[in-house]
């Protein structure tokens, strides 16, 4: 029953046609992986003022996957910012994060937010 409801959700709510919903779900999964990779790299780098870069990069990589990746990036970014606002994080920082998220999802170069000295590994 749950898989059936997920399919109906994709058709009705997400507006995905029957020929592309498998592709959409694949892109969403890959986009989620891209977002996780950016988060993991941010934690590993532990570099001052690098969070906007990693936000933009995760969204950029996910959106390159296609509509499913862009959808996953938006859902994950919005949820993350919503949780952080709820826990008392500053509204100005949240707006700046959302700006970086949208920048990356729109296909603009995430290196715009890259801090000086961040190792080339990232």
Curated annotation (Swiss-Prot):
Induction: Upon cytokine stimulation. Residues 100-122 are annotated as: Disordered. Pfam families: SAA (PF00277). Keywords: Acute phase, Amyloid, HDL, Secreted, Signal. InterPro entries: Serum_amyloid_A (IPR000096), Synovial_Prolif_Regulator (IPR052464). Its main location: secreted. It is found in: Secreted. Transmembrane segments: none annotated. GO terms for cellular component: high-density lipoprotein particle. Expressed by the liver; secreted in plasma. GO terms for biological process: acute-phase response. It comes from the Eukaryota. It is linked to Reactive, secondary amyloidosis is characterized by the extracellular accumulation in various tissues of the SAA protein. These deposits are highly insoluble and resistant to proteolysis; they disrupt tissue structure and compromise function. Major acute phase reactant. Apolipoprotein of the HDL complex. In vitro exhibits antimicrobial activity against Escherichia coli, Streptococcus uberis and Pseudomonas aeruginosa. PANTHER family: SERUM AMYLOID A, SERUM AMYLOID A PROTEIN. Belongs to the SAA family. This is Serum amyloid A-3 protein.
């Amino acid at each position: 029953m749950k898989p059936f409801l997920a399919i109906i959700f994709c058709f009705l709510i997400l507006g995905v046609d029957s020929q592309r919903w498998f592709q959409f779900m694949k892109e969403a999964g890959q986009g989620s992986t891209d977002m996780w990779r950016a988060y993991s790299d941010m934690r590993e780098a532990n570099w001052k003022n690098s969070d906007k870069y990693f936000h933009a990069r995760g969204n950029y990589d996910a959106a390159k996957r296609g509509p499913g990746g862009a959808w996953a990036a938006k859902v994950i970014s919005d949820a993350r910012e919503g949780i952080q606002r709820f826990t008392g994080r500053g509204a100005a920082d949240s707006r700046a994060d959302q700006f970086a998220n949208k920048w990356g999802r729109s296909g603009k170069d995430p290196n715009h937010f890259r801090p000086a000295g961040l190792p080339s590994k990232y």
